């Protein structure tokens, strides 16, 4: 079972496998299908969910927030990413607040800069 997790330097255990959510939540016509797919993954033990504020302009985060209700937050490993242009002060505070609101949680397990370079033109 220990092979399923990577122990980070702070002692936290991060699942080695997870679910990416790029392009999820963008189309209301398949929202329930996407929610069921995420639930199926969670039910099978895929507890790491990766998203970003740019995925559907927050709609992916909102889908995840709706989906994880009823699951133990402590058993999930939520990762989100901030746009590079929002990574400075004060924008990063607004971005993380919006992400937490969208995900309906009060903390993230990991928060990353989506890419460390200026936005492509």
What are these regions (language model features)?
Residues 28-29, 47, 87-121:
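Glycine/proline-rich, positively charged
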Residues 1-76:
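N-terminal binding-site loop/beta-alpha segment at the start of enzyme catalytic domains
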Residues 22-24, 52-54, 81-85, 113-116:
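Active-site beta-loop-alpha junctions enriched in small/polar residues
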Residues 77-79, 109:
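A structural signal for isolated positions on well-ordered beta-strands in alpha/beta enzyme cores
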